[in-house]
Amino acid sequence: MKTIQRLGAVALLAGGIGLASATTVHVRLTGAQEVPPVKTAATGEAVISVMPDHKVSGAVVTHGIKAFMAHIHEAAAGANGPVIIVLRHSAAHTWRVPPGAKLTGAQYRAFLAGDLYLNVHSKRHPAGEIRGQIKP
């Protein structure tokens, strides 16, 4: 229930003034999506919104993981890529896109093509324990 409340709050924030034309994506994060796949019971859900002017907002809520970092990366499913946005730890199990985050033109095109992903890192799996492709 807390997850639904947190994601509901994220959706309300993303649905604020001026976000009517945003592309909003719901993302499920699992270890199976990592490259290479990670065996873990940890999961996550995210709501990410991208405006036509390339501004990004949203958050990830995790379960069953003691995360120390979370990022948005650029790469297609099945590949690893560079960090493009560092998420901020804002509350227990919640990571948010920082205010003012914005994609470049090339990154925006990658977003539209489904070639961005969320990655959450733990001490147990420092390269990433759970991942979810951001597919508009």
Where are these regions (language model features)?
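A generic hydrophobic-segment detector
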Residues: 9-13, 135-136
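Bacterial N-terminal signal peptides that target proteins for export
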Residues: 1-11
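Hydrophobic h-region of N-terminal signal peptides that target proteins for export
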Residues: 11-21
